[in-house]
Amino acid sequence: MNVSERIAGALYGFAIGDAMGATTEFMSPKEIEREYGKVDDIIGGGWLHLKAGEVTDDTQMMLCVADALIDSDLMFGSSSFLSGCCSNFVAWFNSKPKDIGNACREAIARCKYKPFSEWFDVALSKDKLGNGALMRCLYPAILYAITGKVVFKWAAETQGNLTHFNSVCRRYNREYCDALQSLSSRCRSRRSGVSIFLPHQAGAET
């Protein structure tokens, strides 16, 4: 399995796990057993009343960040990446998704069409410690793990500031990147096909 296949597997695995896990979110083991018995397939339902295979805000916001990163000139500055994240979050918010976390909802609703610097002001809070920032950072974390380029670790950390601006959330995004890098170190030498997942400008980097 080459690196591009591993990256695709991580992204598909994220979405599949989201679609499967949403069925029993917020349920106790006893409630799950009573309602479903054993969940070993993607069946939808749950408190969001999802269709089988439908994903939640976790996957949807992760893809917002991934799209912004792919379209950015991140290697030459941060503004296009962060502005892209903001624009993608707003477009997603306007699509009326079934669920949005409280911190994400507040930031997007209050900062629509404003510069990303104003998002930081709204998101600044030591109490916003949910996983909303972490759930979105998979794509830049993967690219950091595979390439070792610190700019991708920075992207994973900084996109979180748009909705969860505090040191705790920044730390766990950095640690997530480090964990992925450690796990992927064995395949670092087999980079075949990885350039198709990089931002347009970064693909030319060695």
Each predicted region: which residue ranges?
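Structured, active/binding-site neighborhoods that engage oxygen-rich ligands
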Residues: 1-206
